[in-house]
From Swiss-Prot:
Ranges for region Disordered: 104-138, 151-186
Alphabetical UniProt keywords: Membrane, Transmembrane, Transmembrane helix
Places the protein is found: Membrane
Composition-biased stretches (Pro residues): 108-133
Organism in which the protein naturally occurs: Mus musculus
PANTHER family hit by this protein: TESTIS-EXPRESSED PROTEIN 29
Protein name: Testis-expressed protein 29
Extracellular face residues: 1-56
Organism lineage: Eukaryota, Metazoa, Chordata, Craniata, Vertebrata
Cross-referenced InterPro entries: TEX29 (IPR031685)
Stretches that traverse the bilayer: 57-77
Membrane topology: Single-pass membrane protein
Length: 186
């Protein structure tokens, strides 16, 4: 005869009575107890050890999160229902007063807006007209070199384009050469 190990299996009617545990999800309830005693402790029996039904932390956190979201949803729905009933309960005018308003409307005076004063225009500074161009000067000499005429250069003699001014002092006579010669008094 051959020696073979036989796998002992529980009969089907016993498997229905005692659940097989998924070990990672359970804690040990008690050792060396019978199946009946394990069941009376509301535990599950697996390979001679009685396991207590336990739920891991991540499953507990998941269920807590579901309860929290469901509670927030229910609170939000209740809040919206309450706000909706408050909007519906706004005081409405009775139908009699609405009919009276329609029968005899009273015109409301609408105030006309007061026109703002128009600001006065700011006067622009008066600009002096440019000096007229003399017939003897070219427009370039007249317009662009005014600063040269006001301050003659030391090495260039001043050109007289205008008529000579009469001397304010009758004793001093001005000569065309540009130098003044004092005269003796008579």
């Amino acid at each position: 005869m051959k020696d073979t190990k036989e796998i002992k299996r529980s009969p089907p009617h016993l498997l229905k009575k005692f659940a097989v545990c998924d070990i990672p999800l359970y804690d040990i309830c008690d050792y060396n107890v019978t199946r009946e005693r394990c069941r009376s402790l509301d535990c599950c029996f697996y390979r001679g050890v009685c396991y207590e039904k336990a739920v891991p932390i991540y499953v507990q956190v998941f269920f807590t999160l579901i309860w929290f979201v469901a509670g927030a949803f229910i609170i939000a729905v209740i809040y919206r229902v309450i706000q909706g009933t408050k909007k519906e309960k706004k005081p409405l005018l009775p139908e009699d007063s609405q009919v009276e308003i329609l029968k005899s409307p009273t015109p409301e005076l609408i105030p006309e807006p007061i026109p703002e004063p128009i600001p006065e225009p700011i006067p622009e500074p008066i600009r002096e007209p440019p000096p007229p161009v003399k017939k003897t000067e070219s427009p370039i000499e007249a317009g662009c070199c005014l600063w040269m005429k006001s301050k003659p250069a030391k090495d260039q003699p001043q050109k007289e384009t205008a008529a000579p001014e009469p001397p304010s002092n009758p004793e001093v006579k001005k000569v065309n050469s540009g130098s003044a010669v004092p005269q003796a008094a008579p």
